[in-house]
Amino acid sequence: MGYHNVKYGKKAQRRNYSKTIYDVDLPNLIEIQNQSFDWFLKHGIKELLQDFCPIESYNGDLKIHFDDYFLAPPKYSIEETKIKDISYVAQLFVKTTLENVLTGETKQSNILLTELPLMTPTGTFVINGTERVVVSQIVRSASVYFAGNFDSKLNRTTYSGQVIPSRGAWIEYEEGSKEILYAKLDRSKKIPLSNFIYALGFDSKEAIENVFGKSAIIDSVFDKETDMDSDNALVELYSKIRQGEKVPVDTARDFIRTRLFDQKKYDLAKVGRYKFNKKLDVLTRAENTYLACDFVNPETQEIIIAQDELLTKEKIAILKQNRHFLLQEIFDAKHNLENETDEEILAYKKDPQKNELFTKTNIINSRTGEVLVAKDTLVNDDIINHLRHNIHTLDEKVSKFFLGTKDIYQKEADRQGVFNEILEVYTSKDESGKLYHKVKLIGNDQRETKKHITLSDVIASINYYLNLYENVGTVDDIDHLGNRRLRLIGELLKNQFRIGLTRAEKNIKDMISTSKFSEVNGPGDLVNFTFLMSVIKTFFTSSRLSQFMDQINPLAELTQKRRVSALGIGGINRDRAGIEVRDVHNSHYGRLCPIETPEGPSIGLITSLSTYAKVNKYGFIQTPFFKVLHQDGKTTLSRHIDYLTADQEKEEIIASAGFVLDANNAFKDKKIIARSNGETGIFERSQITYADVSPKQIVSVATSSIPFLEHNDASRALMGANMQRQAVPLLIPESPIVGTGVEYRAAKDSGCLIIARESGFVTYVDAQKIIITKKPNQNVSLNGKTLYDTTQEFTYAQAKALYENNYKEHQAEYTLINFAKSNQDTLVLQKPIVVLGEQINEGDILVSGPSTSQGELALGRNVTVAFMTWEGYNYEDAIIMSEELVKHDVYTSIHIDKYEVQTRELKKGSGQEEITREVPNVGADAIKNLDERGIIIPGSEVKEGDILVGKITPQGNIEPSPSEKLIQIVIGEKAREYKDSSLRVPFGEGGIVQSVHYFSRKNGDVLPAGVNENIRVFIAKKRKINEGDKMAGRHGNKGVISRILPKEDLPYMADGTPIDIMLNPLGVPSRMNIGQILEIHLGMAAKKLGIKVATPVFDGVNDYDLKEIMKEANLDPDGKMVLYDGRTGEPYDSRISVGVMYMVKLSHMVDDKLHARNVGPYTLVTQQPMGGKVQNGGQRFGEMEVWALYAYGAAHTLQEILTVKSDDIVGRNKTYSAIVQGTPLPKPSIPESFRVFIKELQSLGLYVELIKTDTKENEVNKSLIDYKKEGYN
């Protein structure tokens, strides 16, 4: 038997045809959103506040410390924020201390940092009443990158390098003309690499050769330099960065030090330090080279690895254990560019063992010459405060050293030398076995944890760059996922907070520098975080990564939360992105879906996470693999799972998911298909180190819901994955007969269902709420009667007793959503799928929502399909449908439109707008459905033009027309004072009024300035499927309904069953999506057997399984049958493929698009009719349509279309008059667009005239007023 029955949740069961022995459950599909936001709340804010703490006044007298932070509870619930059109936020407070440094006094208060939008449990944000999703951004990781390009002129490869931080100055290396190597700092002009090396602190070529070694490449770098030293090089480097500005060497040194080694200006972040240490590790380069000298333990003189030995992986492992012996000091603390020079250091240690600093010289008042602090005085807090008190009289060097941002004792602790790991190796061996080509490898200090770059890193990066010319080291693939990482919501928010706090810091510094401690009540008087609030608001409302949630169905919602975008700030520009960055990369395997991506200009730039993908703490995407064990000559699969990044996967040989195991989990086949370093090949089973956990781990959730995916062309699979996200929720949803097994988890994790938080029994259920009574932790008794005893099993009777006696602490209440409007104007309705008394386990699904059925994804319906033509009506993928599907609401959907009206305060003396039933100049019939306030009654049926809310607006002092005067005399004074400004049903709309929301300033509702009342009316309309609606299968097979036929005209089977849908058979071979053919055969068999099946992607029903199930269902082996013409009763000549296909109705509906224009607006400049349904625009008659009329020689029609029907202002008015008066149509005049063209030529200095032969006048310059004078009308 090639299948097993599997339960999906408590309500659904499928016959699963998966061949995989281990069914690894999918991880939580939206954890990347929730976990990242939780990290930001717990750690991200804390790290930021530490970076900005303390903020000092310019003279150092006052300091502001951020001690701690806390979130106040949200004022409104998630549901309330959606109703009131406000954001779901919590106030973020920071505990702030204002310190007077001179006296030690402090003042404390809690200050509002910002209103922080909170993430809902389903991974979304509610901003101004609408749900939004922040998508993850994929960017290049901070690291050291090297690239190589073959130069045909030089006939060799030239190299370039980039040292990229998360924030700060880049260092770049490149080869220029004349084979000279250059360096650039912070995108400045380039300087020779030799000068850049000198600038690091080297004073001579000999000193450089001592570190970098003697080699041809070093000689080529330094052969043109003679009198350069460290000081001159620093001044030159400063000059290049500052566009030629010349300064003393101390200023240049200080500038470079600040640019590179100050954490406020330069930030690698954790990921940058991890990648720097990984790339610049000397041992990574040393693999497969030969040791140039003995590697000795200097303490014991023991030879750990002998000279000339090949450095294999095992030898490298030994070196790693003893890597501290590789360290060599390049510069001592005194000559380290990161540290201050001897001249700048004004304190010293008398005793190296004690942590005490003494002044080097007398510290003098520069104005009076008075000695403020004597030489050899111990520097303590009192001395520092004394100096701070006299800061304005101190020399600049003194104040900078003693009163700088960093404590002098901390500076002393950080003052260290520069250490690098150095190893000399041979790279080549001749035929006689003699080693040659000696190379010196320099790595950075692997003990380093600093978040900024160090001199050790810079020296190692230069050496790596030079090593590339000696064929040591590797170039980087920037599209590899080891070099690209995700910025999740937590990091994106942290970056925005940093921008806001940086702006606020300057403002706070200015405030505390101009304030006195005694005159302020607390830090709240000095601190203003308006900048931060503005930045956060802008990010959530207008960032490219903050998107209006695609709420059309659960799959669309889930996919958007797992979406990965390369666009946005710090990302890729869509217009400049090449094919390489968009293309599928072998490192995407199990991490990014190779199928699901948009079809337009964003193709490849917006992708989706694969099903099992997770994101590690550095932002790199991981995918799971089973560990493979080798014991007793057997290769077995363990149940242990490791999550590997793309970099870690490089080192492994990973078996593809189609492997075969015996009863003991040992691999049966000696040769196994596996991947190594991104390439697929055949390997011995003894070489295998890991194995795929599932065949579907390569694709995303949307793609894995396509059955028989492996039989479809990739571009059609892409369309199928994308179109499922456009499926409209149907009135009666139905899960697919042919599924893939992911439908349950996709629906559960999407966020549109209610999941039980705890186990228990259902003690109350209706359409509004579900109450689950859970098991108490202790005995419960009431009036001497035991309601629950912990020694007994918890039963429904006990749960019912607890519920009836109102024990709220043992109840969990779940509120259902009833007739809500989604972001895409579709209906959101939750219905219970549990019954009273049912036992519930934690994690069970309690309701079915939009596009779900029994807890499974249900985007469409299972319909009987025949691949045949019918009178040519399914030409070009068109679909022919049975009228029965319309009658029985198979593809009917409900849509809700929102209409809004406000009453506003008018300018002083003009009165105010009113909501009223007394609307002037309308009959009783127009207001019959309004309540006493003048608002439509819910449940009323309305059509185009009907009043929804009666509203009147004061007219002001405008003289009424004679007819209005007559009405005023008859009706009264009110008609004169007010005009009708009621909210009416727009053109082409209508339906049933579903609900009305009324907000008023009097009731305490929050409304925008100047608004007194706000009324929202929601109208629901039922849309049956119609000709012109777009439908699709799951295999990229899409089409528009061309005909809806009566039941009696449709082809029928031998038993009289009519066909539901007819599809064009020509739509299959050219599109190469054979999956749909397999689906109809399997669907027909499953329907006959009364079962549902799961055929997972790459691992489902094969030919043998399909034959067997068709045989079981008594179907013909070819899946074809004789159909009869419904009109004649005659059988068709050929047997026809008939089966059951799952088809969805897409959101592209004809009701939204069908449109006709009678009268409407014109564009201002060209005076041509506006376009589109929203503007009540016309149908564009474009260039190609004009060609068609040329071809037919329809001159009069063409002249009409180009003039009086378009932008001939004079002609169209004359034509209107002629039609009204019944006179012949006049000749057209000049179109307005021609006048615009002439004006554009005039703006270029070309004077164009169009002289009329009879009047000799220039027609182009005539205005509409001139024509009116001539009396054209």
Curated annotation (Swiss-Prot):
This is DNA-directed RNA polymerase subunit beta. The lineage of its organism: Bacteria, Bacillati, Mycoplasmatota, Mollicutes, Acholeplasmatales. The keyword Nucleotidyltransferase applies. InterPro entries: DNA-dir_RNA_pol_bsu_ext_1_sf (IPR042107), DNA-dir_RNA_pol_bsu_external_1 (IPR019462), DNA-dir_RNA_pol_su2 (IPR015712), DNA-dir_RNAP_su2_dom (IPR007120), DNA-dir_RNAP_su2_hyb_sf (IPR037033), RNA_pol_bsu_bac (IPR010243), RNA_pol_bsu_CS (IPR007121), RNA_pol_bsu_protrusion (IPR007644). GO terms for biological process: DNA-templated transcription. DNA-dependent RNA polymerase catalyzes the transcription of DNA into RNA using the four ribonucleoside triphosphates as substrates. Keywords: DNA-directed RNA polymerase, Nucleotidyltransferase, Transcription, Transferase. It holds the Pfam family RNA_pol_Rpb2_45. The keyword Transferase applies. The RNAP catalytic core consists of 2 alpha, 1 beta, 1 beta' and 1 omega subunit. When a sigma factor is associated with the core the holoenzyme is formed, which can initiate transcription.
